[in-house]
Amino acid sequence: MHNITLIKGDGIGPEITDAVVKIIKAAGVDIVWDIQTAGADVIEKEGVPLPQRVIDSVKRNKIALKSPVTTPIGKGFRSVNVQLRKELDLYANLRPCYNLPNIETRYENVDIVVVRENTEDLYAGIERQVDENTAESIKIITRAASERIAEFAFDYAVKNNRKEVCVVTKANICKLSDGLFLDLSLIHISEPTRP
């Protein structure tokens, strides 16, 4: 039996999670769902979009399934996704992209996995209103996070028999921040066990 946090979210979130729960149940997987709510709908009841009880549930169960969650646009509330990433140190975002069998597509033999650092850069969500006509976002890149995501990406490539790793940056424009990330990634590329 598995204890899993289920964050139902809001908007289309509950509809999606209900369907996923039915599919998992039909597959015969024995799960005890720890149902939690987060998002815009929760603000009215609890004053925040991501109550501490949700984070505690994920930490306790060590696994969660989260549906779409709305964060109100404007001042006052941090994105639920950004909060979860920070609180749980969810630094690596994997996005696989590949062709499905028997489905015709414009491009054949697509098999790409994008690995994105999830806690820094503009995803840190550090912003301020300079004046009524200007807003500012801060792009933070640190050596520690850059080394950690590069290590993760290259280890993933080795473990999954990937032949190539492409490092994507805007180092031509953001010479210091993306330049730091690029330099640290190139160190990992030069290791003999790397693709």
Question: For the regions a protein language model found, what residue spans apply to each?
Answer:
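Short glycine-rich or small-residue beta-strand-to-loop segments that form or flank ligand, phosphate
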Residues: 3-9, 64-68, 165-171
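Short connector loops at secondary-structure junctions
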Residues: 34-44, 168-177
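N-terminal glycine-rich phosphate/adenylate-binding segment common to multiple enzyme folds
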Residues: 43-136
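Internal alpha/beta core interface subdomains
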Residues: 116, 121-169
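Loop-centered beta-sheet repeat module
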Residues: 162-186
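Residue-level detector of conserved catalytic or cofactor/ligand-binding positions
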Residues: 185-195
